[in-house]
Curated annotation (Swiss-Prot):
This is UDP-N-acetylmuramoylalanine--D-glutamate ligase. It catalyses: UDP-N-acetyl-alpha-D-muramoyl-L-alanine + D-glutamate + ATP = UDP-N-acetyl-alpha-D-muramoyl-L-alanyl-D-glutamate + ADP + phosphate + H(+). Keywords: ATP-binding, Cell cycle, Cell division, Cell shape, Cell wall biogenesis/degradation, Cytoplasm, Ligase, Nucleotide-binding, Peptidoglycan synthesis. InterPro entries: Mur-like_cat_sf (IPR036565), Mur_ligase_C (IPR004101), Mur_ligase_C_dom_sf (IPR036615), Mur_ligase_cen (IPR013221), MurD (IPR005762). It is found in: Cytoplasm. It comes from Streptococcus pneumoniae (strain 70585).
Amino acid sequence: MKVIDQFKNKKVLVLGLAKSGESAARLLDKLGAIVTVNDGKPFEDNPAAQSLLEEGIKVITGGHPLELLDEEFALMVKNPGIPYNNPMIEKALAKGIPVLTEVELAYLISEAPIIGITGSNGKTTTTTMIGEVLTAAGQHGLLSGNIGYPASQVAQIASDKDTLVMELSSFQLMGVQEFHPEIAVITNLMPTHIDYHGSFSEYVAAKWNIQNKMTAADFLVLNFNQDLAKDLTSKTEATVVPFSTLEKVDGAYLEDGQLYFRGEVVMAANEIGVPGSHNVENALATIAVAKLRGVDNQTIKETLSAFGGVKHRLQFVDDIKGVKFYNDSKSTNILATQKALSGFDNSKVVLIAGGLDRGNEFDELVPDITGLKKMVILGQSAERVKRAADKAGVAYVEATDIADATRKAYELATQGDVVLLSPANASWDMYANFEVRGDLFIDTVAELKE
């Protein structure tokens, strides 16, 4: 990693632990900063805080005392999940203290070039596809960021022979200043996380931060299926490389069942190793990045053909007596579930849906769920999802939790059917995150098979 001295002997407050906060605290300590960590979880239930204290880092747990900011901190590094209306963050900003996320730290120390991937849906799959293609081509794509490996941790071990392939959320991108990827991808932009950002325009602005420092020597890969992406083209200094499944573009595109890059066939769409029209878009974005990095068509084709998907994103779990189970717990919004359903014959799908109630109506989902065999509905949003099912003419049953939903879905399915967990909602009404929800689905499927 690059050894930088801009944090040496500076007082830095790390707000919120989890993986990214813990990684940031250790990195800042290594760089000579005077680090204080503040986390809401009580110390006795906080292994990360206990570990950091043993390493000599100051920790304050069990709450977020505003008087802590009476100290003269030069910087705050916040956990990306903490909203900007948090009183600690509001006070820090009012005092003129810069508030960053650990993605910025990763950029500052990274010896490796960075490819950043953001968007409303498809981030994880596209990030993984890009990482696997680059690694197959000898460019060693190191996955990091929102995909589960803290960027600041991976950046410490990356050399200039590697490529940091970062999945970036809007939460993370709100906290960057100098962050400068060589290639950035925006998979798509849909109204999500409005409860965090306040409006769709603020959400788009957060995503757009990915390209703030890019120049004409850098490449911004955009989804030209969306008029919004086309409109944004004039608002960047970067060289835009489009991808589309709807039209021929000066980039990656679908035509007559083939995936092209600038007029050259790379592979057939039906050779992609994972189903669904959304994965064609993900593959096109990957092809654009790979070709910009000089990867040959055969390597791209072989890697994407063998691609097995990502856990919790249309993940094939098992087959029990001819009933296939797919875990799409990462589908936390309507668009993601629409795209998941596009890969299946509705008449053979039992869909498990529902979760955190964010006030959404699900009318947009009605055309996509019409013709489903059955639905199993759960969670805070159940009444709203049931209204959509009624409009679509789909019969449903209710469930108390994911385990109950999985069992009921299996009872409703017959040989040749698919049980699809694709909730179209966040998990936080019942579960800590979509991973926990998906893992419970996987565990229940395993129990059903016994």
